[in-house]
Regions:
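P-loop NTPase Walker
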Residues: 2-99
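ATPase/helicase motor core of nucleic-acid motors
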Residues: 264-265, 314-320, 329-425
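Conserved helicase motor core of SF1/SF2 NTP-dependent helicases
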Residues: 35-47, 52, 63-66, 86, ...
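C-terminal accessory regions
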Residues: 401-498
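Catalytic glutamate of the conserved HExxH
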Residues: 216-219, 478-479
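Interdomain motor-coupling "hinge/lid" segment immediately C-terminal to the ATP-binding subdomain
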Residues: 96-185, 262-263, 269-313, 319, ...
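Conserved P-loop NTPase-based nucleic-acid remodeling module centered on helicase motor cores
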Residues: 57, 65-135, 338-341, 345-355
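Accessory N-terminal region flanking or inserted into the helicase ATPase core
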Residues: 2-24, 31-33, 45, 121-213, ...
Length: 498
């Protein structure tokens, strides 16, 4: 039974799985986990399900503001408020602090100057970046070990050359803890990180909804999920929606087993949404080797899957995706496509910015010095990381080598350091899927997107653990009609290449 006055969807035939979800929203006595696979109509299903919920105040938590705004325009129900969890946190802060002001540009820097104004400039910059990241990922940080783990994972350990006088790694981490205490006290001016940090650190998060629905839960950090759970009234319900097999942001603080841990904590009933309306049947079969419950819609086209030699990516056309686990191979692909006269970009403007900062850090006078400078820098960084927790350091070492390979690949096509920097600024873009450009992207950056034809650089993928398998699943399920697996191990079928 629908609620009185709620608009009824028309001309839509819902699946058995979708109807089970609607019934759970209507009558399930406790919390619910909806495990929704790639391209299964998750958003449409949840918006329809909300119409069955009897609660009078519903919070729909979204991953980012763009998604929250889109959801709010589609809800058309006064009981439902779609917002990011940062916006939820901001509401908690406004309730506690009169005339609070957001200053995203100066807040983090001002906190450093208040606590450590006598620090060398390089240390101040490092402190600013690290205390911001700790506020985002561990509002409850109490020990230097809590801080160090985040510093290593995000390349926020200062260079040995920057640690002088009283500044050791130990004092650096202790200072971050002092800044956190100061940030919790000075709350009249805040930034984005404070919107999660302050409600949790100060205990300001309280129940505001009878039903809390968290979308894309597998991508949320622990603190984001915690603030969502605290928003639910004691006798209310929580619905967690996500795909554990799209959990690929472990480096960003989203745990790969986060959905299962939430299910256990909430003692939630689980429902599945496993039929994809995106991928052709042949593509689904590839994905099923990784995720057995993944299914093609009965009306899905057959789709095409083929393997191809390494040079095949040169056939990519505007509108296609070329996906890799890491950035370095994408540089060669993008440059090769541009030489053919095709528009190509590498997704991730911030990646290009980071590489420009690395080039500046190397202080090169000649392009010929790049190779040696990168070798010295990478050896120094890896040697330092070898003394740290290896589970954390391993990811950072891989990033270091990817940065080195990316810069060396681009350097082969330019004549000066200045030209290298200019190309980095123009090649990397936040442009999304477009019919006018070949989008070269890491798998992480392509999550949530789709294309008719997707080229996957197979040899960049690793095996051996769940998150690596998840990356392959995400890559494969970006393709709607054609999936091309590019590999050096390609063997042409008898009678010639396919």
């Amino acid at each position: 039974m629908r609620l009185p006055g709620v608009a009824k969807s028309t001309n839509r035939e819902w699946s058995l799985q979708q109807r089970a979800i609607f019934e759970a929203f209507r009558s399930a006595p406790g919390h619910v986990l909806v495990r929704a696979r790639a391209g299964t109509g998750k958003t449409t299903t949840i918006l329809e399900a909300l119409q069955y919920a009897p609660e009078s105040k519903i919070l729909l938590g979204a991953f980012n503001k763009q998604i929250a705004d889109e959801l709010q325009t589609r809800v058309n129900d006064p009981r439902v408020q779609a917002k990011t969890l940062h916006a939820l946190g901001m509401g908690y802060i406004r309730a506690q602090v009169d005339d609070v002001r957001v200053d995203a540009n100066n807040r983090a820097w001002d906190l450093v100057k208040d606590v450590a104004d006598d620090a060398p400039q390089a240390i101040k910059i490092a402190l600013k970046n690290l205390h911001t990241k700790v506020r985002e990922l561990n509002p409850w940080a109490e020990t230097t070990s809590d801080v160090e783990r985040i510093a290593i994972a995000y390349d926020l350990v200062p260079d040995e050359a920057e640690l002088r006088g009283k500044w050791t790694e130990g004092t650096y981490y202790e200072t971050v803890l002092t800044i956190l205490e100061h940030a919790a006290d000075e709350v009249e001016v805040i930034d984005f990180a404070d919107m999660i940090f302050l409600p949790l650190r100060r205990g300001w998060a309280w129940p505001v909804a009878d039903l809390v629905v968290v979308d894309e839960a597998q991508d949320m950090t622990g603190p984001q999920l915690e603030i969502a759970l605290r928003a639910c009234r004691k006798d209310g319900r929580i619905v967690i929606v996500g795909d554990d097999r799209q959990a690929i942001y472990g480096f960003r603080g989203a745990a790969s087993d986060g959905l299962n841990r939430l299910k256990a904590r909430l003692e939630a009933v689980e429902l599945g949404l496993t039929t994809t309306y995106r991928c052709g049947k042949a593509i689904v079969e590839v994905a099923r080797a990784l995720v057995p419950d993944f299914q093609a819609a009965p009306t899905a086209p057959e789709g095409t899957v083929r393997t191809a030699p390494l040079s095949a990516w040169m056939e990519a056309q505007p509108g296609d995706f070329v996906l890799s686990r890491v950035n370095a191979p994408l540089m060669g692909v993008a440059l090769g496509l541009i030489r053919q006269g095709k528009r190509a970009r590498i997704r991730g403007r911030d990646i290009g910015k980071g590489l420009v900062e690395l080039v500046n850090k190397l202080k090169l006078s000649r392009l010929e010095d790049l190779d040696g400078a990168l070798e010295q820098w990478s050896r120094r960084e890896i040697a330092r990381l070898s003394k740290k927790d290896q589970a954390v350091a391993r990811t950072r070492i891989a990033q270091i080598m990817d940065n080195v390979d990316t810069l060396l690949t681009l350097a082969e096509t330019v004549a000066s350091v200045a030209e290298l920097q200019r190309k980095l600024e123009t090649l990397f873009s936040d442009e999304g899927a477009s019919e006018s450009v070949v989008m070269c992207s890491t798998i992480h950056r392509a999550k949530g997107l789709e294309a008719g034809r997707v080229w996957v650089l197979e040899d960049t993928l690793k095996g051996g653990n769940l998150e690596e398998e998840n990356l392959r699943y995400v890559a494969v399920t970006r393709a709607k009609d054609e999936l091309v697996l590019v590999t050096k191990n390609y063997v042409a079928p008898e009678g010639g290449e396919q």
